[in-house]
Curated annotation (Swiss-Prot):
This is Chaperonin GroEL 2. The keyword Lipid biosynthesis does not apply. It is found in: Cytoplasm. Keywords: ATP-binding, Chaperone, Cytoplasm, Isomerase, Nucleotide-binding. It catalyses: ATP + H2O + a folded polypeptide = ADP + phosphate + an unfolded polypeptide. It comes from the Bacteria. It comes from Rhodococcus jostii (strain RHA1). Forms a cylinder of 14 subunits composed of two heptameric rings stacked back-to-back. Interacts with the co-chaperonin GroES.
Amino acid sequence: MSKQIEFNEVARRSLERGVDKLADAVKVTLGPRGRHVVLAKAFGGPTVTNDGVSIAREIELEDPFENLGAQLVKSVATKTNDVAGDGTTTATVLAQAIVRGGLKNIAAGANPMALGIGINAAADKVVEALLAAAKPVEGKTSIAQVATVSSRDEEIGEMVGEALTRVGTDGVVTVEESSTLATELVITEGVQFDKGYLSPYFVTDLDAQKAVYEDALVLLYREKITSLPDFLPLLEKVAESGKPLLIIAEDVEGEVLSTLVVNSIRKTIKAVAVKAPFFGDRRKAFLDDLAVVTGGTVINSDVGLTLKDAGLDLLGSARRVVVSKDETTIVDGAGTDDDIKGRVAQLRREIENTDSDWDREKLEERLAKLAGGVAVIKVGAATETDLKERKFRVEDAVNAAKAAVAEGIVPGGGSALVQASTELADNLGLTGDEATGVKVVREALQAPLYWIASNAGLDGSVVTSKVAEQPKGHGFNAATLTYGDLLADGVVDPVKVTRSAVVNAASVARMILTTESAVVEKPAEENEQQTGHGHSH
C-alpha cells in the first residue's frame, strides 16, 4: 500500500484542521447553556447528547491528514474520561486553544521543542495551583452540587449524592436503563452476587419468590458437592444447631440436592443452595472474600479440608440471607472489622498494581462488595433517544462526584482555570520560546470560560476579562448569567476533572506542535487509478 506524506507547516496545518473540526463539534455542548449534538447510528435511532467523549468517538474525517489531528485530540477526550470520567469537552477545547496558539508562534519562527518545554512547565504549574485551591467535599449536599453541575439536573444530582453517601467512596454506583418512565435509586445492603437458588423448592417467601433466612450459617465449598455420605455428617450437625444453612459451592448435584429439597419441603432442615459465581481464579478469590465477610473458612481439598470432616467451626454466619431466582444477598456477615479492613487493603494494593483495565474493574467490584455496598440508579425516560441522553448525564454525574470526593473541588464554570492562569504571569522565569510556550497556555486557559459564556449567548471576551478581575473563588455563573461566589452557589468542578483536562490537553497539543511530517495511506481509488489497467497514447 503506497503512502502519502506531508511535511512541516503543511502537515501541522492539516492536523490543526482536524483538531478544529472535532473541537468545534464538541465545544457547542460546553456549560449549562450548551447545545446538543445529534449522532447518526448505523443501527437504531439517532443519539442526542451533550457528552463530549461520546461525540468525539463518533468522528472520523474523510481527509486522512485531518483525521490524524482529529484522532489525536479524540485521545485527549478518552484519556480524560478514563481518568476522571468527565471534563472531556473542557480538555478538547483546551487542546484546540493550545494548538492554535502554538502554531501561530511556530509560523512566526518559534522553535517547537522550546515551546513544548514551556507548555509542559505551564501545565505543571496550573495543576499545582488547582490542587492548592482545592476544597474537600464533605457531606451529601456538596456531592449533590457537583453531580448537579455535571448533569445539569437537580434531581439527578440529589440521587447521585444520596447514592454515594449511602455506599461510601468504595461502593459501586451502577447506572442501568429502567423499564418505567421514572428514574429511581436502589441500594443493596451487604454482599450481593448474581447467582440464585438451584431449586425453586427452597423458596420460603412465596409472594416474593425468595428464600429468606435470619441468623443463618454459611457453607463455602470450592468444589462440587455430589456425595451424600460425605455431606450427611455436616448436615446432621447443622440440623442439631437448629439454624438455617446457605450453601455456596461450585455446584450441588444429584442425591445431595434432592435430599436438601425434600428436607426443606418437610421443614426438617432450613437450607438453600446456590452456585458460586464466576470461574477459575475469580471464583476462588470471591469465595475467599465471602469467607472474610462471613467469618468462615473455604473448605477445599487443596488445604486438606474435606466435607466429611468439617465441623460447624468452619462455617460462616450472617444475620440475614436473601436468595432469589437470580441473585444472593448476605447482610451483616459475622466477619470481624479488622479482617475485612485487611482484605480491603489487599484489594486496594492489587488495584494499584494491575495494568489491565478489565482486571481493575473486577477488583473494584469486589472491593465495593466488601467495603461499601452497591447502589443502582435506574434511569427512565419517555423515548429511547431521551433515555440514552439522560443515561449519559447520570454516568457523567456519578464520575464527577467520585472525582470530587477523591481530590476535592474548585470553583466551576472555567473560572478556576482563568484564575490559575495568573500564576503564569511571570512566564515562570523562562525566556525566549520557552516563555512563549507558557504564554500560549496562559491564553488557552481562557478558552473553556470563553465558550461557556458564548454558548450562553454572551460575549466570551468580556466575560473572561471580568472574571480575571474577580476575587479568588468568584466567577461567572452561566446558569443564572450572574457573577458571584461560585462555591456558595454550588457551581463547582472536581479538581481531578479539571487537572486531567489540563494535563492531557497540554500533552497532545505538544505532540501536534512538534510534528514535522505526517504519513497516511493513499486512498484506495487513487492507488487503482495510478496502477490502472488500460493504456494511454
